[in-house]
Structure formats: C-alpha cells, structure tokens
C-alpha cells in the first residue's frame, strides 16, 4: 500500500511538471471573437463615465455532494463581457484608467483588468489547464490580467479613489471559498459606504448589462441558430425513435447523446420527458416512467451551445 502511494505521488509530480510547461489550448474554432467582448466592455465604460468604476465577479462553484462539484458554468453577465469560462475571477472596468504592472515588470495604464487564478501545475493535473494571466491577455484580448493575490494587496488602496459611482454586484450567500476571499474587500468597502453615507453612489451593474443583452449581435444570432439546429435534429430523431416499452430516461439519454454529438456542452435546462399522466406536469424531470402504448409524450429539451440555448416546441 505504501509503495502504491509513493508511486502515485511520483506520477502526480511528473504530470504536474509536464503541465507547468503546457499552455491553455482553445480546441473550439467557432468562438465569438475577442473583439466583440472588448466592444461590450467599452460600451459599459462609456455608459458609466469617467468618474465611476464597475466590478463584476465570476459565478460561484457549486457542490453536488461530498467532494463532487457540479460541472462549472460561468455567470451569464461575466461571460458576456469576457468570454472567460473559469471560476474565481474578477473583472474591473476603470474608464479613467489605472496603472498596473504587467508580468511584474512593464508598467501600463489600462481601463480593464481581469484577475484570474494563478497557474497551478498540481491542480491542473486534476482539473485541466488554466488560462493564467498570459492566456487571459492573449486568448481573451484583455488589456491586463493579474493573479488574484494582486487584487487585495495592490488595487484596493487606489481603485476607488476619487470616484462618484461604484457599480458592484451584491455578494450573495452562495459566494464562498476562494471567490468569497477575492470579492470580500469590495463587499467590505460597499458596507462601509452604506454605513458612513459616503459621497459615492452605489449602483448595481446587472441591470445595465441585461439591457445590453436584449439586442443580439450577429455573432450571438449565429450561436442561437446553431443551438436551435442541434435541438431540432435531436427532437426529430427522438420523435422517430420513441416507442412503447421505452422509459422516459431512455428518451432523456437519447437527447443528451444527440446534443453532445453535435457539440453542445450542456442542456439549456433540465430535460423534461413526461409520458402519460406526467405529460401535464410543467417542470417534470423525474423521467423514470415506462412509456405505454397510447401515452402522450411531452418532451421539452434544448441544447446549450457556447452558453446560448434555444428550442423547437415538441
């Protein structure tokens, strides 16, 4: 047993050393261009003005049970502005500019900074490679990307100096762990502003971004069409395949297979396959009943593609 543990430890170290030299790879070739995300961030800065700062944080990781997490999905607004898919990240938009030290050497005045998890070879041997600061700037087109530890030690001293408006998301109770540690200094500043009736006006940036998201760009429409096409193919195949004696979960499995076979990452929402009396339950997702001859089967399933989802009515 001890020998096996030692061998496993050596193997993990070898993998970690290999990962240290490997950079993040984008396997997908149809992603929305980084220029589109850049234009969105610029639009936000134009709307909030020179005397404001906007802060957005990534969606929290969620635990399924014990030490098993749900597959991570980025918060919609954060993804809309960055295209970044990793957890524990923070986006700062500063229209008037802020001076940062990139790669611990080059000093530069920028309007946007993305704080990300540091590269960690051992962690990456378990969960896959991370963007890191280099990947965030190169692949996402960020003006500056710094590791999360730099935020509290460097930026909180000067970030909010001289501003009139602070656009900051409320920190909700499901924000825990590393993300909570990252955003807590901002929440403490917000709480201080509320208590001392500061001259800084607090505003929620989500409403502004939601308004932007109402109007879809040509790139988004392409993604929506792709999601729709995937869903239509799956629905048509499911209608030809369903038969008495099948179970609702078999139909669900067929949808999942057909979605992912076409490149979809997730369902757009939990898949509903209700047969017989279950067909009138609006959000039924138990999907365990046997489908009998003469049953009406209602399927409400949609593919999500690059964070967009659309469906064809069944």
Predicted regions and their residues:
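A broad detector of the eukaryotic-type serine/threonine protein kinase catalytic domain
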Residues: 210, 236-240, 277-278
């Amino acid at each position: 047993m001890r020998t096996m543990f030692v061998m496993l430890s050596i193997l993990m170290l070898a993998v970690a050393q290999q990962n240290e030299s490997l950079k993040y790879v984008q396997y997908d070739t149809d992603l929305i261009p980084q220029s589109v995300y850049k234009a969105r961030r610029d639009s936000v800065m134009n709307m909030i003005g020179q005397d404001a700062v906007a802060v957005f944080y990534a969606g929290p990781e969620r635990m399924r049970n014990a030490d098993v997490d749900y597959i991570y999905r980025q918060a919609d607004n954060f993804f809309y502005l960055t295209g970044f898919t990793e957890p524990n990240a923070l986006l700062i938009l500063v229209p008037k500019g802020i001076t940062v030290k990139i790669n611990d050497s080059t000093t530069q005045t920028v309007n946007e900074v993305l704080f990300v998890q540091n590269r960690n070879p051992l962690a990456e041997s378990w969960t896959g490679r991370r963007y890191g600061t280099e990947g965030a700037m190169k692949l996402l087109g960020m003006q500056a990307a710094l590791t999360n530890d730099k935020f509290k030690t460097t930026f909180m001293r000067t970030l909010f100096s001289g501003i009139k408006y602070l656009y900051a998301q409320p920190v909700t109770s499901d924000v825990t762990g590393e993300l909570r540690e990252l955003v807590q200094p901002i929440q403490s500043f917000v709480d201080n502003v509320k208590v001392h009736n500061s001259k800084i006006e607090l505003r929620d940036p989500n409403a502004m971004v939601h308004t932007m998201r109402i109007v879809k760009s040509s790139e988004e429409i392409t993604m929506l069409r792709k999601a729709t096409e995937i869903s239509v193919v799956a629905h048509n195949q499911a209608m030809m395949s369903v038969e008495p004696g099948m179970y609702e979960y078999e139909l669900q499995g067929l949808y999942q297979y057909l979605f992912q076979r076409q490149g979809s990452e997730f369902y757009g929402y939990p898949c509903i396959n209700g047969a017989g009396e279950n067909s009138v339950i609006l959000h039924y997702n138990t999907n365990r009943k046997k489908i009998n001859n003469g049953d009406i089967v209602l399927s409400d399933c949609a593919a999500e593609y690059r964070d967009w989802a659309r469906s064809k009515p069944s």
